[in-house]
Amino acid sequence: MVKRFFESYHEVPDGTQCHRKTYITTALGGICGIIGSAYRVSLNPADSTLEAVARVGRYTFTAAAIGAMFGLTTCVSAQVREKPDDPLNYFIGGCAGGLTLGARTHSYGTAAMGCVYMGTAAALFKIGKLEGWELFPTPKV
């Protein structure tokens, strides 16, 4: 399922159909949030069911918001700069996602490190896509 989302994200050229790309990155962020919250709730059980649901929602919606900011910022940056295949657009989008995480945690340090790390990871992802690196290689039998 995640592989299909990655493929559908790259079907649309960068800088076009921002609403579709933002939807896809929001869904990917939400999936990551659900997975992370499942680990969090199972490894650190909550005292009540309501608290567990609140934790799941908090992690899921935070990750979805980070994905949405990444998708929207990357697409708008590609349109404004008129350079759709530039890894800098992905760095800017990753930085926006890191700043969103910092705003959620009320921490300048988290925002700064999130900007650097998420921006670098996103730029490397774009560079890998441009150079033909495989994120999900097919097994060789």
From Swiss-Prot:
Top-level taxon in the UniProt lineage: Eukaryota
Pfam families, A to Z: Tim17
Keywords: Electron transport, Membrane, Mitochondrion, Mitochondrion inner membrane, Respiratory chain, Transmembrane, Transmembrane helix, Transport
Its membrane topology: Multi-pass membrane protein
Cellular component, GO annotation: mitochondrial inner membrane; mitochondrion; respiratory chain complex I
Compartment annotation: Mitochondrion inner membrane
Keyword Transmembrane: yes
Function of the molecule: Accessory subunit of the mitochondrial membrane respiratory chain NADH dehydrogenase (Complex I), that is believed not to be involved in catalysis. Complex I functions in the transfer of electrons from NADH to the respiratory chain. The immediate electron acceptor for the enzyme is believed to be ubiquinone.
Family designation: Belongs to the complex I NDUFA11 subunit family.
Assembly, per entry: Complex I is composed of 45 different subunits.
Protein name, entry field: NADH dehydrogenase [ubiquinone] 1 alpha subcomplex subunit 11
Organism: Mus musculus (Mouse)
Name of the gene: Ndufa11
